[in-house]
């Protein structure tokens, strides 16, 4: 499943909406119709250069062109597509699918200059570009030095595998070292390579702590790759890889169990050892262009804009955060595009469904049958999400109607909460509602014992309250339009006092 499916609210009823397959069907069946309707957005005068035509670069160009910017993409390879075209195996995605993505941005007026390597962002600025987006990826191979014997890098192998259609000389026994998604692609490609009989996936932790997606690992195992956990490679000699046996230890800074040596060793048959660990970002490019980097060599960026220390220069995708997913690259591209444009990509996008439609789907079981009908199972939690209300055993999170507001608002009632954490566990966002929701306190004393933003009603008749907002406590009269409190919060407090007075402790 994709990350969005792990967070899908449908999980609480039966199984998630099959978002991944639904999007695939939409892309495959809708292309011919959509491509004919695509046009560039209304020109807004912005001129932007994008360095790199991988997923992050293509997404950046798409969002900018859709909003009317003039965009030129510079790509050092002969074709656009980045690692997806040159590294990701064809059994994962076809060149035809990549070509279709590229055709979208070309139809929107984006110019793509292939075979063109950019070394200076200042030269681009001198050519009149208002902003430069660097989307060069994490294409610097990670290394793992053995005491004896040589290894080959996974990115090089995958590139050779794709270029030769699997005719790479590896021998009969191949060991892939690593636990990420790149290691999974490498193992599957090695299994398909001419002359290979056995592929072993060696990882120093257990399956539980692998960074690879669960479905990626399952595919590897289903295809016959042999998984060997708790092994750390030492040396390659005479067709055998000597490994130290490891055991799990205490948790490290990443939240995964650390490993310690047991003192034992194990040998794994290996004619070739492929290392799929730690692809790195192109630090040298950043430094040469005056872009500040952190201790790991990644560009220092403003997370809200993706802008670097060099004014008007943005870094997106793997080049900003290290090897990650295409979805994360697209997110970065959208953030950077909005920052450059100074507004949303498309204004006034309609939200499908009414509030009644959203509520009517709750608590109705609807099992997945086929991807074409999955949209009927969607609970539209991007519009109405009240999981924290539904799962609280004490009913401490309450949905209330606020006059003048289109949607219900959720408040947290402090004195009804025992901090069980249920709402945090079920929240599809990175939130803990019992801490983050605007909170109704029974008294000033209770407010003093908490750090939550919220309010305590001092006098219901005069609507006098104590309010904490952004950590600052102040007195207010909720029905006073001249009060300095935000209009929305005044309305919410008035709704509690007028329509939900049973919540106020006398």
List each language-model region with its residue ranges.
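A conserved FAD-binding loop/helix module that cradles the flavin
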Residues: 316-344
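Iron-sulfur cluster-binding cysteine motifs and their immediate structural context
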Residues: 1-26, 72, 79, 144-145, ...
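Fe-S ferredoxin-like electron-transfer domains
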Residues: 1-72, 76-77, 84-91, 134, ...
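Ferredoxin-like iron-sulfur electron-transfer modules
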Residues: 1-2, 34-49, 85-86, 114-117, ...
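Short hydrophobic core segments
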Residues: 129-137, 177, 270-277
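Beta1-alpha1 glycine-rich phosphate/pyrophosphate-binding loop at the start
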Residues: 16-20, 46-117, 141-147, 185-230, ...
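Glycine-rich dinucleotide-binding loop and its adjacent helix/turn
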Residues: 27-42, 100-120, 141-194, 294-304, ...
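FAD-site-proximal beta/loop scaffold in flavoenzymes
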Residues: 149-171, 251-323
């Amino acid at each position: 499943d994709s990350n969005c499916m792990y967070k899908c609210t449908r999980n609480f009823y039966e199984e998630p909406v099959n978002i991944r397959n639904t999007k695939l069907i939409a892309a495959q069946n809708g292309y011919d119709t959509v491509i004919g309707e695509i046009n560039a957005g209304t020109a807004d005068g912005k001129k932007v250069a994008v360095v790199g035509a991988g997923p992050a670069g293509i997404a950046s160009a798409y969002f900018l062109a859709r909003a009317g910017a003039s965009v030129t993409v510079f790509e050092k390879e002969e074709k656009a597509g980045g690692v997806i075209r040159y590294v990701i195996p064809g059994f994962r995605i076809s060149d035809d699918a990549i070509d279709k993505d590229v055709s979208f941005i070309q139809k929107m007026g984006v110019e793509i200059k292939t075979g063109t390597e950019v070394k200076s962002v200042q030269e681009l600025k001198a050519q009149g570009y208002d902003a430069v987006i660097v989307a060069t990826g994490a294409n610097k191979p990670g290394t793992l030095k053995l005491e004896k014997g040589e290894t080959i890098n996974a990115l090089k192998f995958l590139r050779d595998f794709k270029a030769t259609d699997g005719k790479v000389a590896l021998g009969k026994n191949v060991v892939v070292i690593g636990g990420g998604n790149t290691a999974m692609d490498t193992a599957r490609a090695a299994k398909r390579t001419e002359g290979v009989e056995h592929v072993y996936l060696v990882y120093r932790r257990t399956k539980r702590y692998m960074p690879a997606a669960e479905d990626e690992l399952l595919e590897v195992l289903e295809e016959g790759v042999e998984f060997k956990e708790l092994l750390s490679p030492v040396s390659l000699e005479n067709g055998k890889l000597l490994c130290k046996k490891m055991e799990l230890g205490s948790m490290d800074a990443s939240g995964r169990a650390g490993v310690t040596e047991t003192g034992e060793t194990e040998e794994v048959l290996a004619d070739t050892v492929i290392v799929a660990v730690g692809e790195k970002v192109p630090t040298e490019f950043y430094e040469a262009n005056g872009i500040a980097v952190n201790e790991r060599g990644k560009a220092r960026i403003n997370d809200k804009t993706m802008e670097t220390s060099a004014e008007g220069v943005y870094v997106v995708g793997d080049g900003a955060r290290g090897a990650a997913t295409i979805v994360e690259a697209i997110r970065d591209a959208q953030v950077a595009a909005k920052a450059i444009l100074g507004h949303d990509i498309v204004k006034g996008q309609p939200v499908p469904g009414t509030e009644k439609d959203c509520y009517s789907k709750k608590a109705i079981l609807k099992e997945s049958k086929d991807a074409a009908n999955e949209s009927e199972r969607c609970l539209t939690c991007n519009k109405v999400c009240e999981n924290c209300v539904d799962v609280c055993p004490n009913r401490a999170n309450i949905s209330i109607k606020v006059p003048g507001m289109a949607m219900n608002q959720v408040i947290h009632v402090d004195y009804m909460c025992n901090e069980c954490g249920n709402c945090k566990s079920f929240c599809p966002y990175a939130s803990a509602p019992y801490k983050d929701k605007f909170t109704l306190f029974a008294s000033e004393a209770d407010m003093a014992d908490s750090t939550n933003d919220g309010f305590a009603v001092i006098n219901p008749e005069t609507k006098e309250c104590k309010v904490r907002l952004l950590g600052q406590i102040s007195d207010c009269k909720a029905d006073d339009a001249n009060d300095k409190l935000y209009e929305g919060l005044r309305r919410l407090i008035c709704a509690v006092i007028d329509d939900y007075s049973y919540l106020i402790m006398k």
